[in-house]
Amino acid sequence: MKYQVTVLGAGLAGCEAALWLAGKGVQVELYEQKPTHFSPAHKSEGFAELICSNSLKAERLDSASGLLKEEMRRMGSQLLNAAEVARVAAGGALAVDRDAFSAEVTRLVEACPNITVHRERVERIDESAPILVATGPLTDGALADEIGKLTGDERLHFYDAVAPIVTAESLDHEKVFAASRYDRGEADYLNCPFNKAEYEAFHAALASAERAPLHDFDTGAEQSARPDPDAHGKKADTVTVYEGCMPIELMAARGADTMRFGPLRPVGLVDPRTGHRPWANVQLRAENKDRTLYNIVGFQTNLKWGEQKRVFSMIPGLEHAEFVRYGVMHRNTFLDAPRVLEGSLCLKEHPNVFFAGQITGFEGYMESAASGLLVARNLYARLEGKVLPPPPVDTMCGALIQYLTTENKHFQPMGANMGILPPLPEESRPRDKRLRYMAAAQRAVASFQQWLDENAL
């Protein structure tokens, strides 16, 4: 064999990377801790185990997930082939029998002559040769400590809840206004002003909204605050949470004005429609450089997704908001990617150590698999003495890489969505959203293929 590479983790990213590298003649040493050690979330011994949903999302090219899949196909994804074998009917989405999918991926990996599987737990990273770490968001123990040392952190970045993200174009800009408090500095935030009646209706809906049950493995996360006193018998409230990540619905349950003196405080703001300070105010913070995506500030939540859509659409200006990511509450670990990763997804200070999958901040099944393909290409190029440029930013893979590696003080994981793609030129930008998404997808496919052709391996 010409080269040998170690891959840690046989999840979606690790398997996709191992299969691609093996196809290039690389001898892959693939380490998987199951069945000698299971995370609290994993149950089966198979590879590429899908923990939650069995949906791999939409297939239409004019959808973010469909575009990502097309880029993956052009890179030679074998997990998409496995998904076809395990496909179940799901309308316009690609859904799989999760056991059949895992079995097919496991079969592909174990049948590959260039992959040697080691069923054992790894606690140290040997950076004397290129190594790919794809151990997932539940990486723990000595390996998590090892990664923390390499990245300069005592531990990885833990969080318990994240807020939803909406697209800028779906906001009602007749109601939403740009301003900073007391007009200090740049108007970096968009503001959604409530009058008293609107706020009271919103508070009532939020306080009574249905919350999602936490998985058992989520309740074991490292947490540092007291149990919430307003439990109301709901499982989601019986766990402790970081005070700085308090779900907005728990804050609402503490009293009618709690949010108004917290993230919804209106001080220092004037609603240009009325000339007065709002009764309450929700702020939106840009999530990317192009300001096509906005985070609902302070709205970490554990509401069910349908409830988030219903209740958060009561915020003035968000009546028709398009949610590209709903808020979630669970345990997770991920790298501070903008600080520690190069565009090739190797560590800046330890260039032989590559990362792929959800531990990097790629959010989603297919996103994890796509990152495995991208990193495999970068790692192989390194072995060949080459340096690959990242995919263009007008592709889904390129936009995700740019998001992960661009400085961001509020960095959170991100999945594929059309909002992270740069806008189309105004003169050729269709008004119809579906046509606009198709035009962006066609541009992305052409750009991605050109990148592949110019960087053939």
Q: What are these model-derived regions, one by one?
A:
Residues K2-A13:
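Beta1/beta-strand and adjacent pyrophosphate-binding region of the FAD-binding site
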Residues M414-L457:
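C-terminal auxiliary extensions adjacent to catalytic cores
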Residues I296-F362, A369-A370, P389-T406, F411-N417, ...:
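A glycine-rich dinucleotide-binding beta-alpha-beta segment and adjacent secondary-structure elements
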Residues S368-P390:
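Internal hydrophobic alpha-helix adjacent to the cofactor/substrate pocket in enzyme cavities
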Residues R98-V117:
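Helical element adjacent to the flavin cofactor pocket in flavoenzyme catalytic cores
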Residues A111-R285, D290, Y294-W305, K309-R310:
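Predominantly flavin-linked oxidoreductase catalytic cores and closely associated redox partners
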Residues L19-N81, V393-L404:
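N-terminal FAD cofactor-binding segment of flavoenzymes
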Residues E49-E59, E84-A100:
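Dinucleotide-binding Rossmann-like beta1-alpha1 core, especially the glycine-rich loop
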